[in-house]
């Protein structure tokens, strides 16, 4: 029996609050919750309940002994939030650009899906506090999973950000899925030139329908930071597992370091720019950030997309490097071992790449620390083969930067100069010992 037939037979509707008695290890177990519609990819023989703690549970129909309806679903009257949405002349204007993810979302009880909340009224319902901080202007640019983000999307975001800032907004918040947020933050950091106002990327590790969601606080802190004096691209996410404060990370030095923790984002080889509290308190952790100004931002969106990011591993074949050469790639960023090494038997292929005008850059898969190709013989061979050591750049940042650099020049000496030039805080001038695993 499918769940639709089961519900019809039992005279149960979507949204009803019910009690389910199921068999588990020979004993009866009781669950109470709201009936959710079957999800698109859920098994057809599974009843989904939203428990009172906010979490969903699936129960196989074959295990259900009986069900009882405790309360019928009620149609809630629409609440209008014009008072929140109406602009206030004393507040700054902030545009929130939606690209996907679950930073602000709502449950559709007809389909069971969680959709982005991106009209002004939907945002007011989801996170009304942000309308007390700024006049919010929401714009849904596109709605895709962050793993589907491509360079063309970075460019589209950059132009929309510039348009908003140059029209008088105090700052811009970009709502983005967390998985590839670091790549987009780096891309915007390089493309948005003469930036004079804050650009914040924000996401949520846990969606808004979960009681442990970090979405609301992240969004509140992001809007707070978007009105600050920092004229940089930043990622604002939870600073610890509780709901105390968020951290504002520089866009070129931030990485997602955990699959599910709310404080998954960390500044690597560097200190975050600030701690941000939902009540508006901002504690700056450094003073070398770019200050707010009246400059007009412009978009330098020349990107060479034929760039690869290759991770070194024991047994890696030179055929991988040869593949990218033969396919006409213009750049390769290598995540080397330790100080930036590869097996010696792939160095001839790397040399072939540089001799054919392909830029090859070296980062470290250690994540923390700095590439140094002068210490061991392997590193010196890589230098001789023409490899560009990328200091303490994150592999993701070096990948994005090489795309941007190659969009401006194919001359390898000029590529080397630009890769080793610090454009957006991607290179720290010295190795800090107070940032490791912080």
From Swiss-Prot:
Name the UniProt record assigns to this protein: Glutamyl-tRNA(Gln) amidotransferase subunit D
GO molecular function: asparaginase activity; ATP binding; glutaminyl-tRNA synthase (glutamine-hydrolyzing) activity
Free-text function comment from the UniProt entry: Allows the formation of correctly charged Gln-tRNA(Gln) through the transamidation of misacylated Glu-tRNA(Gln) in organisms which lack glutaminyl-tRNA synthetase. The reaction takes place in the presence of glutamine and ATP through an activated gamma-phospho-Glu-tRNA(Gln). The GatDE system is specific for glutamate and does not act on aspartate.
Listed HAMAP family: GatD (MF_00586)
Domain of life: Archaea
Enzyme Commission number: 6.3.5.-
PROSITE patterns according to UniProt: ASN_GLN_ASE_1 (PS00144), ASN_GLN_ASE_2 (PS00917), ASN_GLN_ASE_3 (PS51732)
Swiss-Prot/TrEMBL GO biological process terms: amino acid metabolic process; regulation of translational fidelity; translation
Gene3D superfamilies: 2.30.30.520, 3.40.50.40, L-asparaginase, N-terminal domain (3.40.50.1170)
Domain Asparaginase/glutaminase: 92-422
Enzyme class per UniProt: ligase
Any coiled-coil regions, as ranges: none
Organism of derivation: Pyrococcus horikoshii (strain ATCC 700860 / DSM 12428 / JCM 9974 / NBRC 100139 / OT-3)
Family as reported in the entry's similarity comment: Belongs to the asparaginase 1 family. GatD subfamily.
Catalytic residues in the record: 102, 178, 179, 256
CDD domains, alphabetized: GatD
Subunit structure: Heterodimer of GatD and GatE.
Organism lineage string: Archaea, Methanobacteriati, Methanobacteriota, Thermococci, Thermococcales
Catalytic activity: L-glutamyl-tRNA(Gln) + L-glutamine + ATP + H2O = L-glutaminyl-tRNA(Gln) + L-glutamate + ADP + phosphate + H(+)
Alphabetically ordered keywords of this record: ATP-binding, Ligase, Nucleotide-binding, Protein biosynthesis
